């Protein structure tokens, strides 16, 4: 896969700079999401930090509800698997008891993230119900 920028170039940009490149037309939100997904694929086997990548959000950021005119236009963003919900997406809160739980609606905060232009591309691990400091539950992840 050909990426739109080198990893050295990627790391020299913060989120607002990456979003500015999308707004200017220098990059597309899809290219940015593909680069983020490639980075996740590269480091996640060692970290086990991302439990789900939303391929549909990577392939079609606008279809995922990201505002193309927001201050964070097209910026890939990972949601903690706890707290704000995304309609139709799993939210299992790091718990076997919640396995298969799908959100019925976006929360207010999720709506604000989307309005700001963030492209919600996946979920990250969380300790069970956020109660402790470690998300190393092999039965869940």
Question: Can you annotate each of these PLM segments?
Answer:
Residues 2-141:
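Gly/Ser-rich catalytic/binding loops embedded in alpha/beta enzyme cores
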């Amino acid at each position: 896969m050909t990426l739109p920028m080198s990893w050295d170039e990627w790391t020299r940009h913060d989120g607002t700079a990456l979003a500015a490149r999308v707004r200017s037309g220098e990059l597309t939100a899809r290219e940015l999401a593909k680069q983020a997904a490639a980075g996740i694929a590269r480091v996640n086997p060692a970290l086990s930090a991302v439990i789900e990548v939303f391929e549909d959000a990577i392939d079609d950021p606008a279809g995922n509800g990201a505002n193309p005119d927001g201050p964070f236009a097209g910026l890939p963003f990972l949601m903690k698997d706890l707290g704000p919900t995304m309609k139709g997406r799993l939210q299992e809160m790091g718990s076997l008891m919640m396995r298969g739980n799908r959100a019925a609606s976006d929360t207010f905060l999720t709506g604000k993230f989307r309005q700001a232009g963030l492209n919600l591309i996946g979920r990250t691990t969380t300790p069970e119900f956020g109660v402790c400091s470690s998300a190393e539950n092999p039965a869940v992840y």
